[in-house]
Amino acid sequence: LGILLAVVLLPYFQTLFRTQASLATLLNPSLLILLIFSVLLITLIAGGYPALLMSRLGTLQSLKGKLQVNGKNRLRNSLMVLQFGIAILLISGTLVLWDQVEFMRTKDLGFNKDQVIAFPLNGKLNDQKAIELLRNTLQDKPNIVSITASNNILGIGKDGNRTTSVLGFEHKGRGVDTHMLVVDADYVETLDLNIIEGRSFRKNLVSDSLSVIINQAMAKQMNEDDILASQITLDDASYNIVGVIEDFNFQELDQHIAPMTLFALPNWNLRNVYVKVTSQNLEQAYDDVKTAWNTIEPNVEFQGSFLNENIERTLRNERTMITMIGSGSVLAIILSCIGLFAMSLLIVAQRRKEIGVRKIVGASVSAITVLLTKDFLKLVVIAFLMATPIAWWTMNKWLQNYPYRIDLNIWIFLAAGGIAVLIAMLTIAV
C-alpha cells in the first residue's frame, strides 16, 4: 500500500518540492537494505511490545481483559506526548518561516520594485542601439515614466539569471572591495534611489564617464571626512565621487548590504533594461513594453517581469522550506489524530461501566465529554511545554542567518499550541 501511494503521489511530490526524485532511487542497494530494515524494525516494535505484555500477564489474565485495564499506560502517554510535541514543533516552525518570508517579501528594499519592469537584452541588436530604439518606441506612451539600463539585474530575472560584479582597489594604502554596477542615465531616478549627498549622473555630461556614485556602505568603508572631494583610482584612471545614495538591498536578504559603486561608462554592455511605469494601469504598461520589444526584436522572446516578481524568485528556497515543514506538520497532525482517536476509543471501552453509571445518576453528555477529554488535553499541554522551548531555540538560531528578520514572540508558539489543542478536541469529539 505504501509503495502504491508513493507511485500515485510522486508527480505531486516532484511538482511541490521542485525535485526530479524518482522511485528508481529505491533500487540503490544501500537504500533498499535500509528500507527493509526499517520495515522489520517497525513491525518488531509494533507487534513485540503487546506480545511482551501478554507474556507477562499470562494467557488466562489476557483473555479476562486485564491487559486493557492496566492502569496508567506510561508508554502510551509518552508516545502521545512525543507525537503532539513533534506536531507543535513543526507547526511553530511553519508559522515562523511564513512570518519571515512575508517580512522579506514586504520589506522596503530601498528601491521601487512595484512600478519597474526589468528584462534582459538578449536579442541580436547592440545594447546601446536596443535601448535607443526602446526609448523612441515608448516615448509617447502615457504609462511609461522613464527607461534605463545596467549590466546587472536586481533579484532573479524571468530567465533565471542573476549576476554581480566585485572589484578591489587600493585607497590610501589599504584594500577596498566594492560591487560594481555600470548604469545608463536615469538609473537612480528610475529605481527611486535616495540621494543623500551630491547628485545623480547627468545626461550628455561627458565628464560623468569619469564619475561614480557610491552607497552608504561604500562611503563608510572609505572613511573620508569629505566623501564628495574623494576619488577612486582604477587602472590608472581616477573617478570623482559625485553622489552618495542610501543603502538599498541589491542582494538577497540573507546578506548585509555590501559596498556598491555605480559607474556611467560609455559603450559598456548594459544587458538589462529597467522601465518605470505609472501605477494606474500596470497591466497596460507591461503590454506596451512587451509590444515595443516585439517590434524591435520580433524573433526573441520577451522575458520581462516586475522587480517585485524578481525579488519573489529569490525567496524560493524559503518557500520550499515552508512547504516541506508544512507537509511534515500535516503528516505529524494526521498521525497524532489517528493515535488520539484510537486512544479515545480504548478509554471509552475501558470506562464503559463508569460512563453508564454516570448517565444513570444524571450526568450530562457535556460533563462526560469533559471527563474523557481532560486527560488528553493534559498530554497536549505537556507536549506544548516541552516542544515550545525547543522550537524557540531552533527558530531563533535559524533566524540568525538573516540580517533582516522578524522578532520571535510568544503569540506564534501559543498559536501553534492552540492549533494542537483544537485538533485534539475535534478528534476526540468525532
Report each predicted region and the residues it spans.
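Hydrophobic alpha-helical transmembrane segments of multi-pass inner-membrane transport and secretion
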Residues: 1, 75-100, 319-353, 381-382, ...
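Intracellular coupling helices
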Residues: 1, 56-67, 338-379
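Alpha-helical transmembrane segments of integral membrane proteins
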Residues: 1, 7-128, 399
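Hydrophobic alpha-helical transmembrane segments of polytopic membrane proteins
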Residues: 31-50, 88, 331, 337, ...
